[in-house]
Amino acid sequence: MTDKQETTQPAEKLQQPEKVAENVDPSLELNKTKVNFTPEKTDVNTYKFYPDDPESTLNRYRFAVKGASEYYDPCQESSKMSFKCLELNNYDRDLCHDYFDAYRECKKQWLKARREKREFWE
């Protein structure tokens, strides 16, 4: 044996750092019990089918400061939900159709906002 013996650390000391959400909007509600997609008004146009807010100030800022070749998705949480649905349902796309629709609606809202108010997104 050598003078320097390797010491192994107990498993308690080798804890992984907490996983930090990489791109989460602080206004995004992640607690499932507090999420309410039904509107307070009876107007159908106030329905929201996805958790993201693609027109938020934070999303505008992140889009403006990203590099020219970087991809930014303001509907990231909806995207994650659709992939999670696929994983849980053995990649059966028919069972996750609603999640795909929610992601699509979020992207439509974002693109429409960018077209209508270009000066806010540059």
Swiss-Prot record:
Disulfide-bonded cysteines: 75-106, 85-96
Single biological process term from Gene Ontology: mitochondrial respiratory chain complex assembly
Entry GO terms, CC: mitochondrial intermembrane space
Physiological role: Required for the assembly of cytochrome c oxidase.
Residues covered by the CHCH domain: 72-114
Motif (Cx9C motif 2): 96-106
Subcellular location: Mitochondrion intermembrane space
Annotated source species: Kluyveromyces lactis (strain ATCC 8585 / CBS 2359 / DSM 70799 / NBRC 1267 / NRRL Y-1140 / WM37)
Keywords from the UniProt entry: Disulfide bond, Mitochondrion, Transit peptide
Cited Gene3D superfamilies: CytochromE C oxidase copper chaperone (1.10.287.1130)
Family (UniProt): Belongs to the COX23 family.
Residue ranges, annotated region (Disordered): 1-26
Motif (Cx9C motif 1): 75-85
Annotated protein name in UniProt: Cytochrome c oxidase-assembly factor COX23, mitochondrial
Signal sequence, start to end: none
Main location: mitochondrion
